[in-house]
């Protein structure tokens, strides 16, 4: 082919080349057209290259977008391949939409059958409703196709599909499973998809877009290994069959399998990709210190040759080479430790000698040849002791092992339920097990009953019309519909939470004593016949058999899935004796004198039925607390499922071939059948007299006759005390039920779920006899978060009185691990002054000694964790014990998080010295006693507890009290290590045995709203106001530190929500503002739980529905808001309506005639012309105040020819610097620019990853810039001829003064002339290049710009009007900025922001460097300018706008629901934004400053933007500016040319009519009326009514000779028209870089 190509390239004849191109096009065109079917999407280069490597043709002109286009193309290609394999007749399509047929190239005439099933919620919208089936069965075609669903199904379901479809022979199935997930490797094709791994499975993310991701358990990867499935009948009624799997095609993670119902040959290996990876040998010890992950062999060879080609390789050289050979796009595929191990391996290899240490054969004499074997043997013997030489070590280290993704297929076995059994079960409404028994009887006794008899129509019942059957049964006729609960069933009345979770705190000393074995009468002989010739699974010390009622029931022991065996009738008989349901039974035969492994049922999906354990021999059950329960033969016990979820047991026996059975009720798989009819239940027992109390009371109708009793539903036989969740009380009419004293203890135990904990509640000061309801309707449990922990003895240093005190409240010592890493983090922050106040002031020697003492391993210390809500008395018992101590005690030290809490302890224990109570920093510096009490430890810095315990080695016992529901410590310094540590409550909560959810502080109403139990009587009083309580020292709680400081300065006793922990007050004030909605539940719980019975809410925020909705989203605060509203509603409803008539509203009137003249107040303030002009000794006065007309003199007329104004503008607006100084400033402020961009990116919703460069969009932007420039008048092009020259310096600026009338409202009638504005004219090529960059970045920005941000660029006033009406919120003050010297203040930080933004959008590096160059070296005739914004540099407007956005995003907290408008240096927000605390440090490093203004958004005080006033009715022009501009145009005789433009702007206010009365004050209304009158006099009424659709008015051509300056203007214009104009040809500049895609030359 190369010779053919070379021959074609030698052809130079244009006609022949044209003919060849046309011939090639005829071949290419149909290919491209066909490729659009599978690939209609626009692809990146990497995606297109990857697809072409798969043999998939892509169309480079496709323009559709998709979140995962490449993976979608592969899916379409797979469908095409499937279509090639399918025959041209009807087939069945499973899990496929009809619209996919076009990708398979199949016509509708084939009449394919579609069968789908709803598995996920999105399937409800994916498939056509007429194709949905409740069960996939009865496939009538020989061939079927299953689309991308096989990996979500189990092997059992596929086997069942073939069994239920006898005609089905071949199944084509596609799966989406990345083979690299078998090894937990990164994606083989990162441009197509990525993979996230977790403990439960992995996430397949096509197109790296989370919206299309799928989660797979690791077990689904077994589909890649399946070769054959041996299908066997679960009930042994029919012969099985074999399914053969063969991989037909593999494209990335998509694979196509053919499943044939036959035993066929398949390849021995299953190949997915070429082997290109190797694993490096292990050369270091331990094995984990080696580079164990596969590496590309090419990269490994590159590294080896580099290490051996460099004279002396250093560690840094190796890291540099690794960075060089790994592309930037692949860096995320490597882990840091992997790179380190890789570098160590090659550094080790580089240090070994590669010159052979063996002798050569050519120079050996006869003596050496004869003695060579001996010398070789001696050498090997010496190496056993001395070690191998470097060359041998090198060869061993270079034995790379190939790493392959190829698999060896595996055979599996799966069970199915025969079609006959399913049919019988459905016809007779019986379980599969019963149907299987019936089928066996049909086969064994065909004369007695045949299959046809079952299928025939049933005979009518002659007794159906009889009201009472002659022989009524004593029990319910159907088990499946109703069942009478037998009270003799194994209810766990003897098993309680106290006895199981905390056996030492109940009447039973151990778990074993709390269980009550019973006798069932079954022996080992009753089971032996069942397990003969049945497959068993070998486990530790035993053999196991798994009997299940369905193959869908999976039973697992010791992480091994047991082989299912069909249910035996003998097991159903045993269930009758035990009176418990079950669908699984595990039978175990233990070896003699052996003990089984610890049995853990927590991995099983056990339902709420108890688990029955039956022992058939002398058995001993051993529990975690070392207690034992002996069982005799035939005895059984019940375990509640809640207990099994947390505990394990072990089976021991001394008898030979001991047998035991465990009965369970388990759930099924995701796509399996439900177990409603597959659960074996015992026959119902007849109620006896002893059970009358358990029977429902029959209802009585109006006639007095008893109505039939309702059917009883089978309920879980579990005592209420072991329920892990609070019961939902549907019929509670009162929030509290108090048990009377006359009730017995048994009735108390029956009515209270926490009956076994009442004694503990009483020891904490509660009666514990009330049922209280939380705000959500749930029963409040006073004891929660119960854990079973192993106890350890108290240390000898703990006094006996403290031991008894803790035991009395059921707080026992446990072993707590103090992590040295947490202590080290706190120590590092102290050492480097990142946290702390007192400790950071310690000298360096103390800090060094402190750090040295903490350099140790984890320390285990004895301690007790006490958790409880506020006011529960967590520290009461400890304080009572401390009151008994002597004054000079040296036993205990109390550590508190705040001074307030320390003073509280000292007040309650005045007898003890003050040094016993320390704040947390003092506890580090000063010595501590052996017993440490950390009160409210959740507010201590992370790592401090560990640091104190490790620092004071004499500490042997610690007590931690706190509330894990309240706020925790917050580190304000993000650089501190402890800011990234888990909270202390997360570390120590697992060591707490229970949580006391009861309080003495809050009244019952308040506590119940917080979900807390309380017995304190009283009424909760809640009131709202917009102000605080004056002349009051009631504590005020505020959401932010800023508000707290402000309130404190005003004399209030203020605290933050999170910082009020430890406060208790009868009444509190809570300030609600916009920050409240962002507070967490912990913070609000802390805040609301401070009061006893009165709360005063202060609402300083808006009262809109959105605001209340946000506050109501907080569960705790919603309860108080609802309470307040209910009280207000009652007050309003109790007040009758006033009988007096109301006065009607006044009608809207037309605008009155405005007084004249309106501008006179401004004219009166004017002084003489000379006093207002700027004076220069060199050039005299400026000439900005022109004519003698006083109205014209209100406006400054800045002209380019005014030398005085020109030099005054240069002195004011420009700053002269040097390139070196500019570069220094740029480097010094890079960090600030980075912060600006990060805030900008967050506000503008930019993606997390950089955006690829789009060459096509760049070309479009370049064409727009070029067309805009060429569309200018020829005269303008000729005047700029010098700047079009390639000899014009790239960094030079031609400086001009901008000619303009100054019409800004704030500068109207300014007494002193202000400097003007400069126009900086760069080289034309420079302007067009960076104008292109600005347009490109503008287009890219719009893709991500959120809807609540409006940028007034390439928009119309109509767009702005729509935005204001739809997005702007006028119910709150607005926010605008008045920047000072905006252009001159854009320094190096802003330049870095622009550079980072350009890099983020992947602007070519040479363009960015060129932009930096002109910004740092911009020069005028006076020298190099400082870094600033110049008006003619190309991206002026866009850059100004972006810098304004970045500045505001960095300075203020701008929420997502804030409407924002930007244009250059003009901006406005529809809410007042709070300044960030971090801006205090940034403000000094930014030149740019601004003065925020806050319009109240009421009549006369609305926000302004680009000359428009934003009102609730829409935008209107500023009345004063509009009127003054019209008067100016009238005075200079230019009104006729500009009247239409002014009328179009005025129309937005004019069309509002009388509604303007609500938005304009009296003065503004006068200006507006006069402007409208002027427009009517100028015949612009049609424009005011119809807008731009009205035709322009033609004025008569008249000249006003008396108007100043008008005759000169007309003469000058006429003279210009007569001048002959030169034509200049603009040639494109050559492409200096070779990048033909960019239209301008780079530098």
UniProtKB/Swiss-Prot annotation:
* Location of the region described as Disordered in the Swiss-Prot/TrEMBL record: 686-711, 1131-1155, 1587-1620
Entry's SUPFAM superfamilies?
DNA/RNA polymerases, P-loop containing nucleoside triphosphate hydrolases
Identify the InterPro entries for this entry: (+)RNA_virus_helicase_core_dom, Alphavirus-like_MT_dom, DNA/RNA_pol_sf, P-loop_NTPase, RNA-dep_RNA_pol_alsuvir, RNA-dir_pol_PSvirus
Q: What is its EC number?
A: 2.7.7.48, 3.6.4.13
Q: Where is the Alphavirus-like MT domain?
A: 59-224
Purpose: RNA replication. The central part of this protein possibly functions as an ATP-binding helicase.
Into which family does the record put it?
Belongs to the potexvirus/carlavirus RNA replication protein family.
The name this protein goes by in its record: RNA replication protein
Species annotation: Narcissus mosaic virus
Per the UniProt record, the lineage of the source organism begins with: Viruses, Riboviria, Orthornavirae, Kitrinoviricota, Alsuviricetes
């Amino acid at each position: 082919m190369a010779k053919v190509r070379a021959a074609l390239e030698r052809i130079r004849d244009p006609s022949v080349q044209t003919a060849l191109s046309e011939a090639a096009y005829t071949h290419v065109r149909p290919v491209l057209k066909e490729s659009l079917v599978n690939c209609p999407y626009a692809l990146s280069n990497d995606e297109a290259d990857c697809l072409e490597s798969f043999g998939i043709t892509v169309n480079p002109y496709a323009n559709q977008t998709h979140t995962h286009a490449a993976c979608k193309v592969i899916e379409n290609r797979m469908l095409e391949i499937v279509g090639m394999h399918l025959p041209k007749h009807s087939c069945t399509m499973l899990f496929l939409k009809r619209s996919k047929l076009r990708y398979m190239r199949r016509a509708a005439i084939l009449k394919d059958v579609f069968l789908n099933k709803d598995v996920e919620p999105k399937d409800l919208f994916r498939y056509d409703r007429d194709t949905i089936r409740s069960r996939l069965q009865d496939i009538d075609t020989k061939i079927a196709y299953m689309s991308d669903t096989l990996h979500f199904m189990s092997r059992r379901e596929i086997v069942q599909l073939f069994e239920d479809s006898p005609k089905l022979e071949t199944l084509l199935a596609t799966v989406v499973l990345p083979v690299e997930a078998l090894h937990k490797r990164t994606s083989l094709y990162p441009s197509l998809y990525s993979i996230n791994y977790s403990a439960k499975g992995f996430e397949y993310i096509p197109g790296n877009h989370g919206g299309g991701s799928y989660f797979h358990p690791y077990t689904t990867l077994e589909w890649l290994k399946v070769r054959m499935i041996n299908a066997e009948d679960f009930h042994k009624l029919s012969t099985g069959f074999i399914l053969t799997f063969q991989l037909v095609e593999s494209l990335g993670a998509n694979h196509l399998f053919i499943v044939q119902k036959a035993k066929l040959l398949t390849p021995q290996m299953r190949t997915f990709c070429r082997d290109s990876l190797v694993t490096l040998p292990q050369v270091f010890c331990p094995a984990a210190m080696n580079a164990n992950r596969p590496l590309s062999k090419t990269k490994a060879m590159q590294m080896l040759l580099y290490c051996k080609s460099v004279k002396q390789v250093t560690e840094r050289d190796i890291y540099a080479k690794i960075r060089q050979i790994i592309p930037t796009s692949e860096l995320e595929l490597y882990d840091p430790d992997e790179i380190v191990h890789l570098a160590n391996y090659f550094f080790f290899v580089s240090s070994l000698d590669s010159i052979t240490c063996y002798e050569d054969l050519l120079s050996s004499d006869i003596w050496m040849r004869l003695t060579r074997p001996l010398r070789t043997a001696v050498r090997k013997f010496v190496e056993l002791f001395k070690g191998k030489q470097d060359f041998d070590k090198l060869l061993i280290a270079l034995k790379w092992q190939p790493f392959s993704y190829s698999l060896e297929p595996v055979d599996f076995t799966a069970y199915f339920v025969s079609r006959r059994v399913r049919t019988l079960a459905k016809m007779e409404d019986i379980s599969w097990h019963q149907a299987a028994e019936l089928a066996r009887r049909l086969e064994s006794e065909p004369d007695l009953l045949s299959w046809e008899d079952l299928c025939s129509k049933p005979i009518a019942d002659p007794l159906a019309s009889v009201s009472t059957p002659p022989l009524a049964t004593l029990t319910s006729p159907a088990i499946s519909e109703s069942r009478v609960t037998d009270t003799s069933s194994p209810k766990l009345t003897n098993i309680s939470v106290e006895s199981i979770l905390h056996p030492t705190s109940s009447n039973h000393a151990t778990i074993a004593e709390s269980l009550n074995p019973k006798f069932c009468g079954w022996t080992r002989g009753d089971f032996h016949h069942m397990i003969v010739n049945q497959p068993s699974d070998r486990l530790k010390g035993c053999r196991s058999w798994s009997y299940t009622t369905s193959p869908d029931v999976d039973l697992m022991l010791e992480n091994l899935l047991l082989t299912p065996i069909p249910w035996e009738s003998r097991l159903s008989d045993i269930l009758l004796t035990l009176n418990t349901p079950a669908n699984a039974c595990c039978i175990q035969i233990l070896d003699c004198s052996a003990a089984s492994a610890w049995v853990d049922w927590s991995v099983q999906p056990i339902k709420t039925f108890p688990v029955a354990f039956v022992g058939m021999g002398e058995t001993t059950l051993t529990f975690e607390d070392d207690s034992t329960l002996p069982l005799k033969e035939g005895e059984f016990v019940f375990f509640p499922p809640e207990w099994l979820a947390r505990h394990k047991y072990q089976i021991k026996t001394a008898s030979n071939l001991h047998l035991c059975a465990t009965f369970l009720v388990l759930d099924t798989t995701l796509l399996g059948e439900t177990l409603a009819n597959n659960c074996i239940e015992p026959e119902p027992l007849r109620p006896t007299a002893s059970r009358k109390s358990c029977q429902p009371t029959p209802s009585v109708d109006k006639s007095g006759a008893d109505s039939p009793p309702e059917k009883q539903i089978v309920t879980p036989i579990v005592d209420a005390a072991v329920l892990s969740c609070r019961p939902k009380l549907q019929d509670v009419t009162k929030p509290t039920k108090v048990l009377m004293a006359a009730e017995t203890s048994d009735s108390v135990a029956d009515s209270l779920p926490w009956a076994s904990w009442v004694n503990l509640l009483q020891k904490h000061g509660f009666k514990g006899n009330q049922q209280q309801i939380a705000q959500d309707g749930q029963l409040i449990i006073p004891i929660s978060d119960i854990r079973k922990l192993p106890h350890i003895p108290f240390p000898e240093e703990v006094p006996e009185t403290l031991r008894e005190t803790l035991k009395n409240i059921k707080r026992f010592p446990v072993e707590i691990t103090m992590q040295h890493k947490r202590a080290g983090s706190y120590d590092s922050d102290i050492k480097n002054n990142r946290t702390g106040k007192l400790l950071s002031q310690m000298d360096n020697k103390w800090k060094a000694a402190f750090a040295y003492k903490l350099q140790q391993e984890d320390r285990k210390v004895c301690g007790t964790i006490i958790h409880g809500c506020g006011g529960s008395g967590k520290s009461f018992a400890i304080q009572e014990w401390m009151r008994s101590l002597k004054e000079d005690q040296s036993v205990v030290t109390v550590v508190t998080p705040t001074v307030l809490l320390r003073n509280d302890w000292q007040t309650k224990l005045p007898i003890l010295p003050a040094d016993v109570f320390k704040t947390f920093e003092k506890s580090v510096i000063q010595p501590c006693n052996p017993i440490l009490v950390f009160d409210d430890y959740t507010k201590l810095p992370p790592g401090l507890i560990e640091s104190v315990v490790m620092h004071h080695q004499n500490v042997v016992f610690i007590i931690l009290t706190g509330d894990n529901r309240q706020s925790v410590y917050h580190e304000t310094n993000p650089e501190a290590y402890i800011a990234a540590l888990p909270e202390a409550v997360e570390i120590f909560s697992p060591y707490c045995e229970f949580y006391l959810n009861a309080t003495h502080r809050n009244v019952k109403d308040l506590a119940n709203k917080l979900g807390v139990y309380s017995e304190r009587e009283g009424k909760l009083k809640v009131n709202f106001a917009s102000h605080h309580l004056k002349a009051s020292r009631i504590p005020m709680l505020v959401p932010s530190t800023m508000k707290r400081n402000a309130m404190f300065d005003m004399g209030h006793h203020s605290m933050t929500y999170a910082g009020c922990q430890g406060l208790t007050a009868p009444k509190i004030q809570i300030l609600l503002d916009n920050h409240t909605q962002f507070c967490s539940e912990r913070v609000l719980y802390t805040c609301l739980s401070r009061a006893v019975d009165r709360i005063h809410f202060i609402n300083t925020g808006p009262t809109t529905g959105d605001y209340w909705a946000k506050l109501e989203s907080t569960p705790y605060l919603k309860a108080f808001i609802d309470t307040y509203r209910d009280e207000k509603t009652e007050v309003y409803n109790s007040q009758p309506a006033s009988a007096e008539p109301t006065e009607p509203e006044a009608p809207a009137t037309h605008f009155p005639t405005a007084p004249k003249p309106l501008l006179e107040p401004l004219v009166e303030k004017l002084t003489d012309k000379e006093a207002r002009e700027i004076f220069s000794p060199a050039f005299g006065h400026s000439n900005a105040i022109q004519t003698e007309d006083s109205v014209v003199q209100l406006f400054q007329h800045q002209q380019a020819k005014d030398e005085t104004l020109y030099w005054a503008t240069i002195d004011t607006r420009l700053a002269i610097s040097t390139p070196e100084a500019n570069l220094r400033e740029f480097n010094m402020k890079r960090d600030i620019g980075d912060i600006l961009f990060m805030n900008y990116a967050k506000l503008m919703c930019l993606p997390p990853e950089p955006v690829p460069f789009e060459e096509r969009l760049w070309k479009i932007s370049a064409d727009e810039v070029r067309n805009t420039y060429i569309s200018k008048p020829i005269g303008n092009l000729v005047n700029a001829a010098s700047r079009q020259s390639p000899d014009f310096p790239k960094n030079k600026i031609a400086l001009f003064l901008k000619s303009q009338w100054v019409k800004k409202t704030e500068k109207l009638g300014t007494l002193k002339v202000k400097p003007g504005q400069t126009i900086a004219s760069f080289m034309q090529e420079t302007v067009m290049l960076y104008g292109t960059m600005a347009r490109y970045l503008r287009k890219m920005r719009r893709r991500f710009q959120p809807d609540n941000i409006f940028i007034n660029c390439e928009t119309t006033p109509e767009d702005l009007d729509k935005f204001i009406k739809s997005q702007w919120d006028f119910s709150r003050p607005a926010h605008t900025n008045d920047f000072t010297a905006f252009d001159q203040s854009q320094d190096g930080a802003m330049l870095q922001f622009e550079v980072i933004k350009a890099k983020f959008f992947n602007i070519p590096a040479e363009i960015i460097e060129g932009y930096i160059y002109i910004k740092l070296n911009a020069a005028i005739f006076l020298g190099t300018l400082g870094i600033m914004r110049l008006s003619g540099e190309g991206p002026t407007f866009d850059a100004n706008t972006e810098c304004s956005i970045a500045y505001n995003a960095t300075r203020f907290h701008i929420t997502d629901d804030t409407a924002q408008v930007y244009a250059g240096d003009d901006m406005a927000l529809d809410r007042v934004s709070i300044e960030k605390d971090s801006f205090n440090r940034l403000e000094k490093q930014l030149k740019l400053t601004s003065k925020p203004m806050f319009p109240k958004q009421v009549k006369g005080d609305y926000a302004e933007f680009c000359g428009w006033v934003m009102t609730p009715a829409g935008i209107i022009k500023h009345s004063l500016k509009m009127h003054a501009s019209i008067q100016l145009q009238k005075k200079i005789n230019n009104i006729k040319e500009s009247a239409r433009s002014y009328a179009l702007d005025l129309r937005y206010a004019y069309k509002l009519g009388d509604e303007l009365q609500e938005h304009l004050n009296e003065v503004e209304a006068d200006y507006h009326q006069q402007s409208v009158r002027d427009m009517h006099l100028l015949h612009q009424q049609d424009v005011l009514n119809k807008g731009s659709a009205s035709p322009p008015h033609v004025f008569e051509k008249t000249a006003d000779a008396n108007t100043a300056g008008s005759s000169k203007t007309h003469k000058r214009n006429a003279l210009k028209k007569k001048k002959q104009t030169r034509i200049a040809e603009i040639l494109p500049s050559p492409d200096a870089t070779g990048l033909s895609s960019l239209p301008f030359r780079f530098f």
